[in-house]
Every structure is written in structure tokens, then in C-alpha cells.
Design a protein with these regions (language model features):
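Active-site region of the double-stranded beta-helix
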Residues: 1-17, 31-181, 189-216
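Conserved beta-strand-loop-short alpha-helix elements that form
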Residues: 184
Length: 216
């Protein structure tokens, strides 16, 4: 899977220049992912989801997550992003994608679907303890990224509640994705994303053995 998304870039070059080092955005080479997350997929996924976040412009909604697509769509139209987690458990195509990534990269793989309404964002500036591969399947989304010097090697068992983004001094970079584009965000890199149009994207997170805990 990784090789397919790299286009003309070799796997060796990706590993030496980008993997766990620096972001990479490539156009059009992830077009095969577009059918994996459409609104039809969402209609099927929402009633199956037991792990969903509803968030709008950095604020997490505390009420129970919607259990039907009409409920989810109503919240989406109010400006809420829907984050459907562990989608590989509920969809065969996304499970195949997760298995393909797991066969190429050592780590625990999970897939999230992000549905973000136009002119909104879900989470504010944050970083993850996973390496993240994002395929845009609908609409447009601008990602802003910064290297993390505050906590450059975060681990799952020591993720702080306050990430202290205000302490960061590194320059910002940006990439806008359209359907078929993809973006790699290394573990620990700051990022946030703003939808220009109603946006659908697949986020493949890979938790490496080293990122599980400080003791590994």
C-alpha cells in the first residue's frame, strides 16, 4: 500500500527522508482510496460505531454520539465534525487497508474516518503518538504543520492534557488536499486541519512499539 501511494518516490527514499522525520504530501497517487470512504460508506458505518467523537472548532461535544445517519448529518450541518474511530472493525474495505499497512510497517494500525463540514475544523493544534497517513476522499482540507520541539517523542502512556502549543517556535508549513491526495504526518508533529469544502478523509494511524510507553 505504501509503495502505491508513493508514486515516483521510492520506499527507500521515503524511509530515509520522511518516515518518523518529516511530513510528506503527494497529489493524486491515493486515488484508489476514494471509494473506501464516501457518504454511502458513512451511512453504513454510523449505526455500527460505538466509538465516535463529535467536535466543533476545538470543542468536544459531551452529549452521546449519534446512533443514526440522520442524527449525524444534522450535527454535521450544525458545524460539527464526526470522527469515526476503529473503522477497520466495521468495514471490509477499510479492514483490508489496515491489514495492508500492517504488513508493511511494524506497529498497531487503526483507521479513523474524519467528516468535517466546510469552513470548520475539528481539533485545534495537537500532536499524536502515532505516525499518521491521511488520504483525502472527498472535498478539500488544508493541513498546517509544525515540528514539535516541546515533546518531540510522545508516548501513549505519557500524553499530556496540556500540550503547551504556545511554547512552540518552529516555522509553519501547509498542504491542501483534494480527493486522491495524501499526507504523511510523523509521530509528534503538531498539526491542525481546516476544511474548505465538506471533507471526507481516511486517517491511518500506526502506533510503533517505541511509541507505546517510555519504558520500551
Amino acid at each position: 500500500m505504501i509503495g502505491t501511494w508513493l508514486g515516483e518516490l521510492s520506499r527507500e527514499q521515503f524511509d530515509s527522508e520522511h518516515f518518523q522525520r518529516a511530513p510528506l504530501a503527494l497529489p493524486r497517487v491515493a486515488r484508489g482510496a476514494i471509494p473506501l470512504l464516501t457518504w454511502s460508506t458513512v451511512i453504513e458505518l454510523v449505526p455500527k460505531q460505538t466509538d465516535m467523537l463529535v467536535v466543533r472548532n476545538g470543542a468536544l461535544r459531551s452529549d452521546p454520539a449519534p446512533s443514526s445517519f440522520p442524527e449525524a448529518l444534522a450535527l454535521f450541518r450544525e458545524g460539527y465534525s464526526l470522527v469515526l474511530r476503529r473503522c477497520e472493525r466495521h468495514d471490509a474495505g477499510l479492514r483490508q487497508l489496515a491489514d495492508a499497512v500492517a504488513a508493511e510497517i511494524d506497529g498497531d494500525v487503526q483507521i479513523q474516518a474524519y467528516l468535517t463540514p466546510a469552513n470548520h475544523f475539528s481539533f485545534g493544534w495537537h500532536y499524536d503518538c502515532e505516525d499518521v497517513f491521511i488520504a483525502q476522499t472527498g472535498g478539500t482540507k488544508e493541513y498546517r504543520l509544525r515540528q514539535n520541539t516541546v515533546n518531540p517523542q510522545p508516548t501513549l502512556d505519557a500524553m499530556p492534557k496540556d500540550m503547551h502549543y504556545e511554547r512552540e517556535t518552529t516555522p509553519m508549513m501547509a498542504a491542501t488536499l483534494v480527493p486522491g491526495d495524501w499526507l504523511y504526518i510523523p509521530r509528534g508533529w503538531w498539526h491542525m486541519a481546516h476544511a474548505g469544502e465538506d471533507s471526507l478523509s481516511i486517517s491511518v494511524g500506526v502506533l510503533s512499539p517505541a511509541a507505546r510507553s517510555l519504558s520500551t
